[in-house]
Amino acid sequence: MISLKHKLVLFYFLLLLTFSSCSFLNQNEPIPSYLYISEFRLKTQANQGSTSERITDIWLFNDTDFLGMFPLPAKIPLLLYGEQNLTIQAGIKENGIGATPENYPFFNPIKVKVNLKALKTDTLKLETSYLSTSKFHFIENFENNSSFFSFLVSGLPENRVLPYSDNNVFEGKFSGKIQVSKSAPIVTVGSNAKYKNTFNPGQPVYLEMDYKGEAPCVIGVQFYDTENIEEAGIIVPIAGFKESADWKKIYFNLGSTLALRKSLYYRVIFNTALPEGKENANVHFDNIKLISF
């Protein structure tokens, strides 16, 4: 049997070992500095449309390394100290999918100089803008009480994307909507104009929009070999969105689809189907922008 004296000796030995271990670990464990980014806004010029954005992540770099991608708002531990030159790029969810984050190629990277200290938190509120080399093929905000998307592929004339003004409007005076019903349960509409397909593999091309709706919607491209308005064209679906009671922002990547097709012309296409059990449904749109370099 272990005596009380031996138990006390063992207890103090273990206690000493514990403190020694903690001291050893603390001496070797690096102490981080912190960077807190609370928000990332978009500023636009008059010819670039709405400031609406959905910047969900930041991509962080210093002079030599990629430091990581972080969801907003972000408190980022860094093993960096003293004056640091950082580059911060705005990240989005490509096609609205959380598993496909991308640093959005059309937003200017933000360059900041910070003086980082151990355990100190530096707070940044960021604002970006479109790169001057961004090319806006069209911007549709419906504020002229007209629609850029009235080319009807299937459905009835009243099923085109029509401007409206009521309490569902996203911003400004007008938004646009497609209505599907029992009489026209599947509706496909396209941009009024055909565009020349001059894109190369790897060239970024995105369709931005704000949306909400009582039905899902698929975004695609209709390809043509000529400018003939009678040509039926080939529709290639790309991605879509589900029903949503609230307005959301989404960024569709059209680049790979446009580059892989050899067709000379294309339209942007929206396809909507009436959900089972509903008599009618509306899908709302605003701030539709087609952007490339």
How would you describe each model-predicted region?
Residues E230-L264, K278-E279:
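Extracellular carbohydrate recognition and processing domains
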Residues N159-T188:
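Short carbohydrate-recognition loop motifs
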Residues N95-E127:
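Structured interaction patches on ligand/partner-binding surfaces of diverse proteins
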Residues T123-E158, N282-K289:
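Extracellular carbohydrate-recognition regions
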